Amino acid sequence: VGTLYAGEAEFEESCEAIKAQEQVDFTHHVIADLPEYEAHNELWNAWGKVKASYDIFVKVDADTILNRNEALSDIYKLFQQPRVTGVQIKLHDYFSDQLISGLNAFSTEVQFKNSKKRLFADHADRNHDLVIKGEDVSHLAPIGWHCKYPAARQAYHYGLRRALKKQSDIVRRCASMWLKYRDDARAWALTGAMEAGWIYRNQFNYSDERFEKSLNDYQNDSERLIKVENYANMVTS
């Protein structure tokens, strides 16, 4: 089980949920406090060095909490089908209040090559035979919670990245949920989304100077929620 950690509020509970998994033997490997692209590449390299000793690799992000003690066992059973090399099972996402594609697992047949795009660092797996997802694994969804307790910094990062990736449906859904509930976390996610632009295409890590300055500026902006409301109404109209 591989996890990338960069200050996510759910990390401790995520680790506890992994530790509580039953009916499987596993190792939990955590890579902390690296930029997203470098962290992913380090994770692929770490897996490549040890995969001969394991059956599958499951990536559980630090903002993801498995919601039952048999989650890893359920995933493992899917790989008993000989052709299956990849599995993707949906998570319940706090921001959009819906199921989203999220948790991924891989057989040892899969190879990882560093992505050419920093924004899509996780698009690195290849040499698949059969990947099962969607309706084929809907009986296991949701397998966990995504961003269950997001802090402001984390929420801002979520919105910025979703908008940079042009995931307009997720942003629109988040805006609809904020207009309904008026919660602080979704407001920060929308703040990040409305800030997204080409100058952030390589400046979306927590440690990036532009990211930090933008977040600080908004924390001191007394009109931020007015801007968020205008943005939310625009993207949902």
Question: Which residue ranges define each predicted feature?
Answer:
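Acidic donor-binding/catalytic loop of UDP-sugar-dependent glycosyltransferases
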Residues: 62-77
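A conserved hydrophobic helix/loop-capping motif in glycosyltransferases and polysaccharide synthases
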Residues: 1-7
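C-terminal catalytic/acceptor-binding lobe
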Residues: 137-237
